[in-house]
Regions:
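Short hydrophobic helices that act as membrane-entry/anchoring signals
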Residues: 1-16, 23, 27, 134-157
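Short, strongly hydrophobic alpha-helical membrane anchors
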Residues: 182-187
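Small-residue-rich helix-interface/hinge motifs
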Residues: 2-57
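Metalloprotease/metallohydrolase-associated module, dominated by Zn2+-dependent proteases
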Residues: 36-38, 46-180
């Protein structure tokens, strides 16, 4: 199982390297001691920075939220250029469309934090003494990162990223039809 996990991290190496960069940046900003910064290692932390446990809510939130948000935003940006051309329009002739499609999948497959970071998030934000309003506000984010961190342990985030890339142009065109109409007029 570890070999499959490492293979998917290598296949999505651009997103893997960028996620380790974001995690390393958060460790540097928050002063979290880092044990191993290698992006590619043959264990369950492949694609993650191995660091000490976070000490407070701010560190934990940043460790889970910043890499997730940055990779998700980049994934959406690249999928707008790649998946829209390939999946929605059906333009199979452009090399940039395929490149953007691959980069979008790579970033989407590497959004979620490690399972240990998610459990740390749960310990800090869902303990008995935590604010109820904060628990409610963070519930959707926690559900997403918890569910996808479990999928990541079994290398299923790659499959989920492909499904997201295929569905993304249709969902986007449904939510923002004006943007799609303008882009079709300009094409």
């Amino acid at each position: 199982m570890i070999n499959l996990y490492v293979a998917t991290r290598v296949l999505t190496s651009v997103g893997t390297v960028l996620r380790t960069f974001w995690e390393q940046l958060v460790c540097r900003i928050c002063g979290i001691p880092v044990e191993d910064v290698r992006a590619f290692k043959v264990d369950e932390l492949c694609g993650h920075v191995e660091h000490e446990l976070t000490e407070n809510k701010k560190q934990t939130f940043l460790m889970c939220f910043l890499p997730f948000t940055m990779n998700f935003i980049l994934s959406v940006c690249f999928l707008l250029g790649g998946a829209y051309k390939i999946v929605y329009i059906g333009d199979f002739k452009t090399l940039t469309g395929y490149l953007f499609f691959f980069l979008g999948i790579s970033f989407a497959a590497n959004c979620v934090p490690s399972f240990e970071d998610v459990l740390s998030f749960k310990d800090f934000f869902y303990s008995k003494d935590s604010n109820v309003v904060l628990k409610i506000l963070l519930a959707p984010f926690f559900a997403v990162i918890y569910g996808f961190s479990i999928l990541e342990r079994y290398s299923l985030t790659f499959v989920a990223a492909i499904a997201f890339a295929i569905a993304f142009p249709y969902v986007f065109s449904y939510l923002f039809p004006v943007i799609i109409s303008i882009s079709q007029l300009l094409a």
